Design a protein with these regions (language model features):
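Secretory-pathway/luminal and periplasmic proteins that interact with or process carbohydrate-rich
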Residues: 57-63, 81-83, 151-162
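Short coil/linker segments at helix-helix boundaries
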Residues: 135, 158-192, 196
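Conserved, well-structured interaction surfaces
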Residues: 86-159, 189-191
């Protein structure tokens, strides 16, 4: 009798588990919008454009892009500006005492802006924005292209050799012209390739 109950329980468990679909695995996040659904109309494109510019401006702390850091990268390191007091935002750049914690700020923040610009460019190329005039869409598209070029130019000036050092043959930074997947690891392009893209 015990064998019959065990067999019935086992068969019932197998049947109940096999009848479940996998749709419960395909839930959309409750606290965000999937990137492919984020830009579907003109207002979404305007919001994405604002987010792109917000990434450039930053929040005026020591890790911001144009809110603070980008000015320091060139001017402080070239002795055009001096940090007179220890602890000032520019002192670490002036002394060139970078730590492992500085790398994400100098690399990730600009590439985050490129990601935002690429998402906007992709949505417009895929004709997701249809409720605006061609001129309105073209303006946003052009702004995203300019921002992407500006950020690539900034990055190659920080991480690449000057173009005149070897006619652009040395390694620069990865040129990213489409949204990347989470595990993509793009290789570095030459300085000349970055300048050509810009």
């Amino acid at each position: 009798m015990k064998k019959i109950y065990k067999s019935i329980t086992l068969v019932a468990a197998i049947l109940s588990l096999s009848s479940c679909g996998n749709d419960w695995l395909d839930r959309k996040p409750a606290d965000g919008i999937p990137s492919e659904d984020a830009i579907t109309n003109y207002n979404d494109a305007l919001t994405a454009r604002t987010g792109m510019y917000d990434g450039i401006q930053g929040n005026s702390n020591a890790t911001s892009y144009y809110g603070a850091r980008m000015f320091y990268y060139g001017d402080v390191r070239a002795d055009d500006m001096q940090a007179r007091t220890q602890g000032m935002r520019s002192s670490s750049c002036y002394e060139m005492l970078y730590t492992v914690d500085d790398a994400p700020n100098m690399w990730n923040i600009p590439y985050n802006v490129i990601r935002r610009a690429n998402r906007l460019i992709e949505a417009i190329n895929e004709k997701k924005v249809t409720d605006a005039t061609e001129a309105q869409i073209g303006k946003i598209y052009s702004e995203a292209l300019v921002v992407r070029a500006l950020v690539h130019f900034d990055l190659v000036r920080i991480y690449g050799m000057p173009y005149t050092a070897d006619n652009g043959a040395s390694l620069g930074v990865p040129v990213i012209v489409k949204p990347l997947e989470r595990n993509d690891l793009p290789s570095r392009n030459t300085v000349a390739e970055v300048y050509t893209q810009v």
